[in-house]
C-alpha cells in the first residue's frame, strides 16, 4: 500500500553568473556525479532528481513554483557549490511549501595540497556559500534540516535518507484523509483536537462517516471473497477451525473486506473506530483493523484521529525497514523495584508488524461494545530499541511527546490475556520517564515503533513546525520542566 518510489526529491545547486560558463559547467558536472552516486545507493527510498544549476532570483523562484505544483516532489535538497548570494533566494524560499534539507558538503573530500590554486578555491566555495545560505534561512525563520559532511560519508547518507522518509510521510499526509467511524469516546480529553488546525499544520484532512454505511457494506460482502480471505488467514496465521471461532473470524473477514473497500474509495490513509458507536456491525473491528494496519493504514481506537495519523506517518517513514509500527496503549505496569516495566496492549487493535512470532487468531468475549465475541490476532511483541510517541492538542499548538524505550522479552506466559502485547522499559528509567510523560501531557494512546528512532520524529516535528519534547537516556527532569515552561512562552509568542 505504501510506495516511497512514487516520490522524488529535487536537488538544487546554487551558484551565480559571476563565475562564468566554464566554472558553471564544472559545477553542474560535479553535482551530477554526486546525484548519480546517491541514486546508486539503496539506502535512499526515492529518486533524487538533479535540476539545472540555479544562478538568478527568477530561476530560483521558478523552480520552487514547480516543486510546489508537483505532487511527486516530496522535498528539496539545496547545496551551494559556489557562493550564491542569498537575497536571490528570498522570493523562492518564501513560497516554498515542501520540506527542505540543506546539505553542507563539497565535491572533493580532501584539499589537494600540492595543486590547490585560486581556480580550485573559486570552484569549491560551499564553506562560505552554505554559510550565506544558512543565514537567509535563519533570517526568514524557515524550518529546514541541516546535514553536514562529505556526501560519500555513511552518516551523511543515513541522515539524508531518514529525512527523505520523513518528507514522504509529510507528502502522504497531505494527499490522503483520515476516516472516522463515529466520534471520540465520550468524556475523554486527550483524544480530542482541532481538526482544522491539524489540516493546516499537519496536512491531515479528517472527516467522519456514519458507521451504518460500513455496516451495510459488511452485509453485502460476497461469500466467495470471505473464503478467499480465510485461505490467506490460514497461510499467514495460526488459525482455529472450530465452529465457534470460524463464525467470528468470518465476520471479521467481512468487516475487513468492507473496510478496505471504503478506505480505498475515500483515498484514506488512516481511520478510527469507537466501541460506543457500532450500529449494526456484528463485532467491534479487531482482526480486521490489525490486518489493515499491517497493510500500512494508520489506526486510532476510540476516535483518536491524532494517533491514527501519527501511526500512518511512522509507517510511511519505516516502509521497507526492519521492525514495525502499531497503535498502542500504556495498559498496566510491572513495578518490581529496579525492573519497572510497561505492558503495552489494547483491547484488540495491535498491529502484527511488531509481532515476535507467528500470530494466533483467537476469539474471546469482549465486555464492552455490546456485540458478539470478536476475533483478534494475539502475539508477543518484538524485542529491541523502540520509540513511543504521542501527539496532543495543547490549545494553541500541537505537541509531540517522544519516549525512547527498550522492548524486552516477555519471560512469563499470560495464558488468560486475550490480546497482543509488548513489554518495554522506558528510558532513562520508569519513574523519570513516566514523570516527564505526565508533565508533558502525553496521551495514553501512542504510536509504538521498532522501525524508526527518535531522529525521524524530530525531523517530522521540525519540518511541520510543531512543538516536540524528547524523553530519553539524557533526560534531566528539572531541565525538562524548564523546557516545558520555555516552550509555553515561545509557542505563545510565535505567529503562525
UniProtKB/Swiss-Prot annotation:
The keyword Isomerase applies. Its EC number is 5.3.1.4. It is an enzyme of class 5 (isomerase). It comes from the Bacteria. Mn(2+) binds at residues 302, 329, 346, 445. GO terms for biological process: L-arabinose catabolic process to xylulose 5-phosphate. Pathway: Carbohydrate degradation; L-arabinose degradation via L-ribulose; D-xylulose 5-phosphate from L-arabinose (bacterial route): step 1/3. GO terms for molecular function: L-arabinose isomerase activity; manganese ion binding. Gene3D superfamilies: 3.40.50.10940. Keywords: Arabinose catabolism, Carbohydrate metabolism, Isomerase, Manganese, Metal-binding. Binds 1 Mn(2+) ion per subunit. GO terms for cellular component: cytosol. It catalyses: beta-L-arabinopyranose = L-ribulose. Its cofactor is Mn(2+). The keyword Isomerase applies. PANTHER family: L-ARABINOSE ISOMERASE (PTHR38464:SF1). Catalyzes the conversion of L-arabinose to L-ribulose. Belongs to the arabinose isomerase family. This is L-arabinose isomerase. It comes from Thermotoga sp. (strain RQ2). The lineage of its organism: Bacteria, Thermotogati, Thermotogota, Thermotogae, Thermotogales.
